[in-house]
Regions:
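A residue-level detector for the "anchor" residue at the start of short, highly conserved motifs
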Residues: 1-203
């Protein structure tokens, strides 16, 4: 299943699990899961709410990293190049395994793991998981973000290109949010006021 720009779907998997698929993301899964394991593949970003089944583990294959769960809520995101994978756990417990099926770490609620495929290195940080996965509810948050990061987020959400004059104090960080249902013009006005810059839409 491929989710086109501007849409987030909620396909019901064969076992009754739900998945919120972010725009421009792709999810692959069989019509029926095998009796011993439930395995899906993700490119992009998705949030999973997995139906518990201790005898049939649920595995998400994310290009070099697999996420193994029994029943839980979490998100998985792969970078465009496929060399970085992020996992955020909301409820339950998940284990992260590399391409050699070696367990790297177990995550607990409100933890985020960033895995770097090339050198098989990972970091784990404490986060506000509900806030970071709020995109599935149509809310886009950013915390301690640079102006460049905010611009990329707006461009990705609205599928537009923006230009702006870089401010003198380029080290500033910002926190804020916007709704995906808001008009782009409104979001640009709010962002300009917050950052003190002037974002211009490239036609």
């Amino acid at each position: 299943m491929l989710n086109p720009p501007g849409l987030s779907g909620e396909p019901l998997l064969p076992d009754g699990s739900s998945v919120y698929l972010r725009e421009n993301s792709e999810l692959s899964y069989p019509e029926l899961f095998a009796s011993s394991v439930r395995e899906v593949k993700i490119k992009g970003e998705a949030f999973f709410e997995v139906t518990p089944n201790s005898e049939q583990p649920f595995i998400v294959d994310a290009s070099g990293l697999s996420v193994k769960v029994l029943g839980t809520s979490f998100s998985v995101q792969t970078s465009d190049q496929g060399n970085e994978i992020s996992v955020i756990l909301v409820e339950g417990k998940v284990s992260l395994n590399n391409a050699h099926e070696k367990e790297l770490v177990q995550l607990h609620p409100n933890q985020k793991a960033d895995y770097f495929v090339n050198d098989e290195h990972y970091t784990v940080t404490e986060v506000d998981s509900e806030r970071l996965t709020s995109w599935r509810k149509g809310i886009i948050f950013y915390d301690n973000a640079s102006l460049d990061e905010i611009v990329r987020l707006i461009e990705q959400t609205y599928k537009v290109s923006l230009m702006y004059t870089r401010p003198e104090n380029d080290d500033q960080r910002f926190s804020g949010a916007f709704l995906k249902t808001q008009k782009l013009e409104t979001v640009l006005q709010q962002t300009n006021k917050l950052t003190g810059t002037n974002l211009i839409l490239i036609q």
